[in-house]
Regions:
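Glycine-rich phosphate/ribose-binding loops and adjacent secondary-structure elements
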Residues: 105-177
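N-terminal capping/small domains of soluble enzymes
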Residues: 1-105, 116
Length: 177
């Protein structure tokens, strides 16, 4: 879960936990919280349609990059971070206005077919100097989705199940999960 869905303190505590048990921490869709990154053992950067924290320096410093195509709790939907959760630090990381709703698109405009996804995987691999590139999908039409993802030749695929959580789902979805 992203910084915004979870507090700064929670994100840092989870990162410290990953260091203690030597596992990976994912940024979530909200960009890179520097203190979380510094305290994690391995750090997976979630590459999302809004392109939060995307620059060559960040792509080179993370352990891996995960392209978010889908998320279990909100398959086919974008995100919504309510204005009251958009602090000064969150606004800065996301490049958004303080105390305004942050709406995340449901998909990448530049990915319309398998070749577009393959091109993005290749581009991110090059820009990150060879970091592993993954693709995150929601568990929906699994065989079709896996075929699409595999065609891009990622290093890993994350299948996100419905039972997961997010602070950015529409209220009707959160209430039903």
């Amino acid at each position: 879960m992203s910084f915004g869905a979870l507090s700064k303190e929670a994100k840092i505590a989870l990162a410290i936990g990953t260091s203690k048990v030597k596992t990976a921490m994912c940024s979530g869709e909200g960009g890179i919280l520097e203190e979380e990154f510094e305290n994690s053992y391995q750090y997976i950067f979630e590459y999302v349609p809004n392109k939060y924290s995307v620059n060559d320096e960040n792509l080179k410093k993370v352990s891996a990059i995960e392209i978010k195509i889908g998320q279990g709790t909100k398959p086919g939907m974008g995100g919504h971070l309510p204005a009251e959760k958009v602090t000064e630090e969150i606004a800065k990381i996301r490049g958004k206005n303080l105390h305004e709703d942050v709406i995340s698109p449901s998909k990448f405009k530049e990915i319309t077919d398998k070749e577009d996804l393959k091109k993005l995987v290749s581009e991110l691999r090059e820009r990150s100097e060879g970091r592993p590139i993954g693709i995150k999908i929601a568990a929906g039409h699994i065989e079709k989705d896996l075929e699409f993802a595999c065609s891009a030749k990622p290093d890993f695929i994350t299948i996100d199940g419905r039972g997961g959580a997010t602070g950015a789902s529409p209220k009707i979805i959160k209430d039903a999960t």
